[in-house]
Amino acid sequence: MATNRLVKNLTGIILLILAVAFVVKFAGPNILRQYISSGIGNCKITPILCMQPEEKSFTPLINAEYKESLIPYNFPKMSVSVPKGFTLIQELIKKPYYKKRHANNKAVIYLLIQEPGAFMKLYPEVQKQGINDNYAFINRLMHARLNQVNNITDAFFVVMKSVFTPDVGNQSTSKMIKFELADLKGFINYSMAKPDNYFDCNVSDQAGNFYKLYIKDIGARLDLNNVFAIISTLKPVN
């Protein structure tokens, strides 16, 4: 059911990708980039479309005392522990989630889980590019750059990057990092420009599950180490 709703919500994006395929066939890379920019914005308007994670993988140390202070919550298919004062919402991937629709002044954490191989089921064609699990899909997506689009695969992942990336505040000051944490690994796009912090966390576990945590930290109470402590509590629930 979740996968069916996900497909429905991304219909517009798929149509854009089909149009991109037409442009690829009859035009060169420069025209292709211009066409994509007309649909999702350019690097000046949306800098993260031309950003990629820092090369070095970050290995955080978790503050055990802080982790112990977190409050545990159970949701369908996943559990997580978070600080007091945050509203939690479990979501599906859909366009409204990733825009500035949630422009209220409440500290909130949006949660998402996708089962192993979910992205392969949605987009089986990517397996021809050697992408065979959720982590490989997200890795390719995070490294996608509009100014390096040369073919339909490049275009697909840039478009998907625009969909998967929520509001992270001032993108001109945002950063992208990759990390490894015990049996978890992934990427964080974040901005820590006061008065508010934003953290877009894309996490995979050893079983192949994909988790997304979007943290809107009103009042800038969290730092990166706090966010890693929250990530470390992610678990699937059968």
Mark where each language-model region is.
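Conserved polar/disulfide-associated segments of primarily extracytoplasmic proteins
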Residues: C43, I93-Y211
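N-terminal targeting sequences that direct proteins away from the cytosol to non-cytosolic compartments
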Residues: A2-A118, P195, Y214-N238
